Amino acid sequence: MIIGVLAIQGDVEEHEEAIKKAGYEAKKVKRVEDLEGIDALIIPGGESTAIGKLMKKYGLLEKIKNSNLPILGTCAGMVLLSKGTGINQILLELMDITVKRNAYGRQVDSFEKEIEFKDLGKVYGVFIRAPVVDKILSDDVEVIARDGDKIVGVKQGKYMALSFHPELSEDGYKVYKYFVENCVKK
């Protein structure tokens, strides 16, 4: 199985390492033609407005939107998968959620902690200017991770979105296995 990592911005190498640790092959996706031959795509963290603009500029936005690929979005990737953020920005709008950007504050407010993750128990989450799910717009959306009363992980069909960075934790590879089992192979 080949999992592509959108390589426009963010911690691409860390995602590639976590994918390999989970037992899959990783491939950088920088251009439209790089989408060929992948079984799923990861949209990493970074700055969501910049990633959205660059995806549009490089022709990736519509291609990804219409690709039917299973997608895991982390941090900014969650924002890009959402239907809205309260500001005008380019989004894929593939998941029936709205998000609050930077819900935990600024860069200096970043933190790490264990969170509850469906079927995995406790998973270590790294939160960096992280968003949270503000509203769930459909019964098709399933909450899979929480930080107290905050929704930090959701799944809808072949799409999964996380507020945190699983690629930055030792046990994060389990989240990639969960994504493959619950979104890619379904």
Swiss-Prot record:
CDD domains per UniProt: GATase1_PB
One Pfam family from the record: SNO
Pathway named in the protein's UniProt entry: Cofactor biosynthesis; pyridoxal 5'-phosphate biosynthesis
Gene3D superfamilies named among the record's database cross-references: 3.40.50.880
Enzyme Commission number(s) from the entry: 4.3.3.6, 3.5.1.2
Superkingdom of source: Archaea
Key words, A-Z: Glutamine amidotransferase, Hydrolase, Lyase, Pyridoxal phosphate
Record's GO cellular component terms: cytosol; glutaminase complex
InterPro entries linked to this entry: Class_I_gatase-like, PdxT/SNO, PdxT/SNO_CS
Assembly, per entry: In the presence of PdxS, forms a dodecamer of heterodimers. Only shows activity in the heterodimer.
Name under which the protein is recorded: Pyridoxal 5'-phosphate synthase subunit PdxT
Originating species: Methanocaldococcus jannaschii (strain ATCC 43067 / DSM 2661 / JAL-1 / JCM 10045 / NBRC 100440) (Methanococcus jannaschii)
Lineage, uppermost ranks: Archaea, Methanobacteriati, Methanobacteriota, Methanomada group, Methanococci
